[in-house]
Swiss-Prot record:
UniProt keyword annotation of Mitochondrion present: no
Chain sites annotated for binding ATP: K242
Catalytic activity: tRNA(Tyr) + L-tyrosine + ATP = L-tyrosyl-tRNA(Tyr) + AMP + diphosphate + H(+)
Organism per entry: Caulobacter vibrioides (strain NA1000 / CB15N) (Caulobacter crescentus)
Subcellular location per the Swiss-Prot or TrEMBL entry: Cytoplasm
Protein name according to UniProt: Tyrosine--tRNA ligase
Similarity section: Belongs to the class-I aminoacyl-tRNA synthetase family. TyrS type 1 subfamily.
Keywords attached to this entry: Aminoacyl-tRNA synthetase, ATP-binding, Cytoplasm, Ligase, Nucleotide-binding, Protein biosynthesis, RNA-binding
Motif 'HIGH' region, chain ranges: 47-56
EC numbers: 6.1.1.1
GO MF term set: ATP binding; RNA binding; tyrosine-tRNA ligase activity
NCBIfam families the UniProt entry points to: tyrS
Length: 419
């Protein structure tokens, strides 16, 4: 840990040393509480998709650090708030999902957390709670009388999630306007039912978190704290968790462990040390050694990052297979059964498929236009040979050992397999 840390609790000292802290309410009071017995803290996740992607990983790791420091994490699933939709950072209303879709998404998301947290009934075991349990029980008039009285419209209009939409003259529904009240009530309910004293989240959630802290302190006169992490972007300014080919999902059903490994292997040089601190359990002295690597040696640090991140999300065996497949593909030029595959109807391949379309469909390019630009830059390969014509037809004649090997640049590979 950093000797200059202003914190005394293991939890906050760890967060500070690894770069998780952006803002904290009542910092000294929280630090004192974290030095005592286990504290209970939560982060909320709305169920807008059947999995979570890397953009949510810093929050998942925050819960992991909490548990590692001897405290109790609550994963709050937004079965109720997802019905409304968080307007934070959005230029338009989210699509409203059916109850069945929300529950299906929650089921998919649950599998992600079991890889990072230990669940159970013990004092520091994680639990998962759905806010639909209490939000769905409120009558409209009851909700307004109990909680609406504690919020002024003047203040609600001042929050960025509202103010920015209005300044851009983009509509915000009354449904969305209520989201911040619902999130504040979540904290109060968790405090009452589970003794939860801390809500954590990204810095874009600061206003919503403050509402919950203040509501809990005002209504029940109980201790309540908030903590946010920095919004994460790569050194080049790209949004964390997205690539040209789409979201970097945390479950194997939507993104293969191989592609997940490759995502971390492709980390920009300037981000390696920061990501090792945030997304792995490696000790800080080992991370310092890896950060000190220069030139081509930095690639070894990237492989360690990829190994550690993939091991955490997919297990030891899948991480090993992903690295072995990468080494075979890039260092030995061989085919590997562990490389991602894209299945295509044999009849379609017999008739011929436009290469640019195949690249887009296989997830190697975000669009046909991007595939054409790759070809023009020499970054599009078919069976290890550069292909300048992205409009040429790929047919059964291109099969080698039963597959067509497509590559975008040096690191993204898919085997096209007829079925």
């Amino acid at each position: 840990m950093s000797a200059a840390s202003s914190f005394k609790s293991e939890f906050l000292r760890t967060l500070e040393a690894r770069g998780y802290i952006h803002q904290i309410t009542h910092a000294d009071e929280l630090d004192t509480a974290a030095q005592g017995g286990p504290i209970v803290a939560y982060i909320g996740f709305d169920a807008t998709a059947p999995s979570l992607h890397v953009g949510s990983l810093i929050q998942i790791m925050l819960l992991r650090r909490l548990q590692q420091a001897g405290h109790k994490p609550i994963v709050l699933m937004g079965g109720g708030t997802t019905k409304v939709g968080d307007p934070t950072g959005k230029d338009e209303s989210r699509k409203l999902l059916s109850d069945a879709d929300i529950q299906a998404n929650i089921a998919g998301i649950k599998t992600v957390f079991s890889k990072f947290l230990t669940f159970g009934d013990g004092p520091t075991d994680a639990i998962m709670v759905d806010n639909d349990v209490w939000l769905s029980k409120f009558g409209y008039v009851q909700f307004l009388r109990e909680y609406g009285v504690h919020f002024t419209v003047n203040r609600m209009l001042a929050f960025d999630s509202v103010k920015l939409r209005l300044e851009r003259e983009q509509p915000m529904t009354f449904l969305e306007f209520n989201y911040m009240l619902m999130q504040a009530v979540d904290f109060l309910e968790l405090n009452r039912a589970h003794g939860c004293v801390l809500q954590m989240g990204g810095s874009d959630q600061w206003g919503n978190i403050l509402n919950g802290v203040e509501l809990t302190r005002r209504v029940d006169q109980k201790s309540a704290f908030g903590l946010t992490t920095p919004l994460l972007a790569t050194a080049s300014g790209a949004k964390m968790g997205k690539t040209a080919a789409g979201a970097v999902w945390l479950n194997a059903e939507q993104l293969s462990p191989y592609d997940y490994w490759q995502f971390w292997r492709n980390t920009e040089d300037a981000d390696v040390g920061r990501f090792l601190k945030l997304f792995t359990d490696l000790p800080l002295d080992r991370i310092a050694e890896l950060e000190a690597l220069e030139g081509a040696q930095i690639n070894e640090a990237k492989k360690v990052l990829a190994d550690e991140a993939t091991r955490m999300a997919h297990g030891e065996e899948e991480a090993r297979k992903a690295r072995d497949a990468a080494e075979k593909a890039f260092e030995q030029g061989a085919l590997s059964a562990d490389l991602p595959t894209y299945e295509i109807a044999a009849a379609d391949l017999d008739a011929g498929v436009v290469l640019a379309a195949l690249f887009a469909d296989a997830g190697l390019a975000g669009s046909r236009g991007e595939a054409r630009r790759l070809a023009q830059g020499g970054g599009l390969k078919v069976n290890d040979k550069a292909e300048a014509d992205a409009n040429r037809l790929i047919t059964a004649a291109d099969l080698v050992e039963g597959v067509v090997k497509l590559a975008a640049g040096k690191k993204k590979i898919v085997l096209v397999k007829p079925v």
